Every structure is written in C-alpha cells, then in structure tokens.
C-alpha cells in the first residue's frame, strides 16, 4: 500500500495594500462629500432665515397711514433704505433716525411720529432694516443721516428690537440723544455723555415695564422715564394686534399725542 501523501493547503491571496495615490483619492472623495453636505446645510439655513424674516411681517394699518399721507403739513419721501418725514415748512435742523421693531413694516410708524414733525419741525428718518430685523442691519448711521443733509443735530431711537439697535448707535459722538419706545438697551451707555428718553406702556407684555427697569442701569445718567398708562407694545406703531402683547386701554391717537409731547420736550431741552 502506498501511504497517503499529506495534503498541502494553498494559502489565500492577501490583497495588496492600497497604494498612496488610491488612499489620497479616497480621502478627497470623502472630503468633497463633507464639503457639499456642509454647504447644503448653510444654503438651507439661509433660505430658512430669508423665509422666516419675510413671512408674517406686520404691515401698516391703512387708516393711520392715509392720515399722514394726506397731511399737508408733512412731507414724505421714500428711498430704498428709509422713509423720510419732514415738515412742509419750518424744518428745525434737528433729526431723528428711528428703527422699527422686528418684522414690523417701516411705514407703520409714520403716523405716530408725524405729530412731532409738525409740532417741533423735526425730520424723522424711519429705516428699512435688512430682512426686517434690526440686529441683521449693521449699516453705519450715515446710511440714514445722509438722506437728510440739511439736518445738523441727530438723535437716534427705535421701538422694541429697533431700540436695542439704536442703543448701539447712541454712543457715537455725533449723536445728541436716544429715544426708546417700548424698548431697552443691551449695551452699556451708563458712562456715555448723552441723554435718553424711555417711553413704556403699562399694558406692554413684550417689553414689560419690569424688563425696562431691570435694564435701566445700562442707560445714561440723564435719562427720563415716562410710563404711558394703558398703552401696550403695539401702540407705539400702527400695525394691529401683536402676538403675546397685552390689551391696550388707551386710544391710539392719545398715545400719538403723548409721544409728540414727550419727544418734543426732550429734544428741546438738550
């Protein structure tokens, strides 16, 4: 008998390691996929912000807007950046750059601010914030003051989030004072040599009187606080009901009269 010869197993072939060019190509593909994914997320986020900022913008009520547009004592000029309110006669050489609240149309403030235009000869430039949100609008103050070259004394002001942005302008040397309507500062102006007027509403549930007083330490020493009994957040403009706000018991025309009287007194006492 012949003895069986031991079977010899043939080892399986081991794949050759990837060459450096192959590994480099794979890394590039992975990096490209990651970059495309990241860019897509940025584009989607930008689209989302654009849609959100332009949906639900609170428009000016037609009645008050018609009143100011048909008032022969007030001149209205619109530019891509702003609305300019000026007295038909007797401009004082003093101006106010006013910044709207978040997602509120700029022309919703024309009627409320037109009273002081007539009473004191004030020129008012109501800005059109980028994306309807003041914190996105980082344009210099001269973007708006240049719209009224005959004005030589400037105040800044705003409503709600617009007031927060106005506070940032208030520290500039060419600004004579700050006017806040239902608003407060986020930056510290306590050591800035300027003046401020803060009007609030007792029925304001957004910029509540408590929130305004909690931030009062950020305002200049020379600040006048004037609470308007019965006014809510939306009463500082004319754009209807605002979600989350309180119910106003004071008529809109009376709020306009108070704004006119207090702003006129403030700018005259400087």
Annotate each PLM feature.
Residues 192, 198-200, 204:
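Short beta-strand/loop motif that positions the catalytic acidic residue
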Residues 112, 207-218:
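Short alpha-helix in the alpha/beta-hydrolase fold that links the catalytic acid
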Residues 92-102:
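Short beta-strand element of the alpha/beta-hydrolase
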Residues 157-166:
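Gly/Ala-rich beta-loop-alpha elbow adjacent to hydrolase catalytic centers
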